[in-house]
Amino acid sequence: MPLVAEVPAAQPLMPVEQALERLLTLAEAAPISDTECVALAHAEGRVLACDLVASLDLPPWPNSAMDGYALRLADLQGEPLPVSQRIFAGHAPAPLQAGTCARIFTGAPMPAGADCVEMQENTQTLEDGRVRFLQALAPAQNVRPQGQETCKGEQVLAKGTRLGPIELGLAASLGHEQLQVVRRARVAVLSTGDELVEPGLPLGPGQIYNSNRRLLVSWLQRLGCEVKDMGILPDDLARTRACLAGLGDVDLILSTGGVSVGEADYLGAALREAGELALWKLAIKPGKPLTFGHYRGVPVIGLPGNPASTLVTFGLLTRPYLLRRQGVCDVTPLRFDVAAGFQWTKAGTRREYLRGRIEGGQVHIYKNQSSGVLRSAAWADGLVEVREGTTPKPGDSVSFIPLSELLG
């Protein structure tokens, strides 16, 4: 497959699945191979660079699952048993004396000779301190055996796993202070367009504030990327060339505002001088135009300029591309079916992603689905996928992708 195969003007629009497949193939051809060792405290969101193998059994010794009494089942002959010791978590017990029981607390190691634990609710303490057991017991009852969770030498996390709170907690439970992770993806973010003004500055005639820059920089940081924020590119070819010349150390150049063939497209002209670009016309709404290519060997993705289009194309296409380059295997966001609480009468030829919110067991859509309305995404908690040629009505099943799946 050519690096930047373009969709000819006369050809059908590229399905979103095909665009994603191409991007993932390109990502796999240019993996980020550099790794580094980081402390668990700084590993949130990073990608594991090698399999994590257990260096010990977990738990490392049999322990009690309950607050209660540890005993030898053979000693339970219907008579109360004296308490020979008290065992707390974090303390080594003495072997259990024959004909006795041990007061034990949750997580405390089992004493040698004991083979079961009775919870304290099923016992009665007599005036002389002996304990009467009120119910029958079975071998190993309420005992967590050594290695119940993990055995030494077992793979517990696979290479390419994104590290979240649960994975970091698991690594800590195995005694790891540091983990080997893939280097952060370095992404340069460029904005183009005479109409863009940075927040805090006065707006001129026909100008708007640059929301896409903040959207993407924040999103990339949440994905664990190292962001090189280049701001708004000037409408000057020489200055644009100079800006691009300093981006040789990044893994991706990400632009918004589109890269065209127009005479005012200084970014496109500068990129084509030392690279290759192609416009993909996608069967997706919002977000039909997507540019992919490379500049001096650095991949380039150009997202459409309308905010909702930027959100959809970054979330569904650019995000998985970046994760795959860092070695993440499963880049598919969770989705589930939910009943539509809306009527959609516009059967289109493109896959539509409506901004919606689940309320009362149904998904409702924002009143204005224009690609320029970012407020629709702030109101929503997910994207409603409307497949080509379909017109969902209230009660129909539609596919829903939570925004939380895309943003993190």
What are these regions (language model features)?
Residues 62-64, 73-76, 93-97, 110-112, ...:
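Solvent-exposed alpha-helices and their adjacent loops that cap or buttress functional pockets
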